């Protein structure tokens, strides 16, 4: 009872904080860091443990308002730089804001995750439901997630491995790698980087991979049913297996369409100043590593 009253008001903690407090189903964790590192891992306890390293004049605050448990820090002169190591229940949704700079790592979550940072990498293993990861000047990496996935960067690469669900990935100046993916809806775009997709092509699925100044590589299962549209201005198209462009399939000099199987899936591959390559599953990544 005493902790609940203190938590609502805000709890001031001293240098090198180490505290544990109970949480309940239905609550979510919200972490804000002005600069430093945020590492969140899962455990089976119905509690959150916060270990933080910070300056002697900085204060870490833990507060509860409604269903949100908030962790932040401040000092006498404004925001504080803190390094966090946090243990939280796997079921607990997580939101992290790192402004202007924070490196964020989350592992073992079985809940929704939202991360946004300006200058710092974002690395997540796990996650269920809505997954939204953003970094302006850092790489974004996601492994083993299931759900609705949105990944964004401006000056960094995006890597997605062993994930399933709808996927949207966009960056300006970076590569996009989508490996071992199970999805019926993929939209990946970059301006100055290549795109690699190795995953399922499901019947009635939608797949759009576009780059302005980079190569686009996609794996195509042997029994895929897809209508494939290819567009490249100054690059080339190459397939590791025979494809036939039917009469009328080439609409312009730089754009054509062909069909595999029943053609129920829609696959759009575009690169203005790069090449487009299509191979069987596993071949694309092996060739790119050589």
Predicted feature residues:
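Intrinsically disordered, low-complexity terminal regions
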Residues: 1-290
